[in-house]
Amino acid sequence: MLHYAIVFFVIAIIAAVFGFTGIAAGAAEIAKILFYIFLVVFVVTLLLGVFRT
């Protein structure tokens, strides 16, 4: 589960870079939303992994 959160977090960062540099201006808002969603998912799964052991 943590692996998927990291993968999607990296994808959101790459999409954000393309969106913020003007390469895909329409995707900037989507990238911002995805970035925050996957940041939350990453932190939650990280905390679950730490407290589970």
Swiss-Prot record:
It comes from the Bacteria. It holds the Pfam family DUF1328. It is a multi-pass membrane protein. InterPro entries: DUF1328 (IPR009760). The keyword tRNA processing does not apply. Keywords: Cell membrane, Membrane, Transmembrane, Transmembrane helix. The keyword DNA-binding does not apply. The chain crosses the membrane at residues 5-25, 30-50. GO terms for cellular component: plasma membrane. Disulfide bonds: none annotated. It is found in: Cell membrane. Belongs to the UPF0391 family. HAMAP family: UPF0391. This is UPF0391 membrane protein Bxeno_A2958. It comes from Paraburkholderia xenovorans (strain LB400).
